Every structure is written in C-alpha cells, then in structure tokens.
C-alpha cells in the first residue's frame, strides 16, 4: 500500500514533519491555499542564547494571497540576518556543519517566494537525514 501525506510548506519544520515525510511514499506540499497569517509557514520558534523567540523570514504583506504566491521582503538582507542568527545559536552544535551546508546551498538569488524557500530547505534537510528517495509533488501536481 502506498502512503501519501499532505502538509503546508513550513519554515524550518519540527521533527514530526520530517517523520511524516519519511513514512510517506509521496509527500504533497499544500501550497495552493490562502496564506495563514501568524503561522509556521514563515516563522518558527527558535532558541536564542537561553530564551525562545520567533525566527522568521519577512514576507510582503498582501492579503488573500495563496501560499505559493507570497513574496519574500528584502530577501538578500533578511536572509543574511537569518543565517547569522542561526549560525550564532547553533555553531556549537555537533551537527552545525550540516546546518551550515544547507544555509550555504540555498540559491537565494533564484528564490522569490516563501513557498520556494521552504520547499528548498525541507527537501535539502530530508535528503540529508533520510536514505530513501522521497517524491514531492507541487501545487500543480508536478513531481519535484
């Protein structure tokens, strides 16, 4: 029996999200629905020093946009700030080299939406932590 999972493309999702991907034969990004404001699509709770705060990548605030159409705001500058925050917080972690590798592989020049950013990072993380090939489907039903 084949298993299919469907989730919105979250911003640096939690471990359970990746367990769902791992246990699926096909994973579908649900990104052709309205962008849910104040959600995990563009932010996540993250530990900085000894406190928990929000880590996010700012987006352009347009109402009634689909997730796949929400554009990043000042993407180059904000991405550099994001990398610095993550690096500062995780540089002592034994697996930091993997995080650093993913952050440096993100083609920020070619990414224009939060959807593209999230899908790239989710697939990059999944490729590192899983040995099996995962099939991903986009909003138009195309394999990625």
Task: Name the predicted role of every residue range.
Residues 1-144:
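Residues lining hydrophobic/aromatic ligand-binding pockets adjacent to catalytic sites
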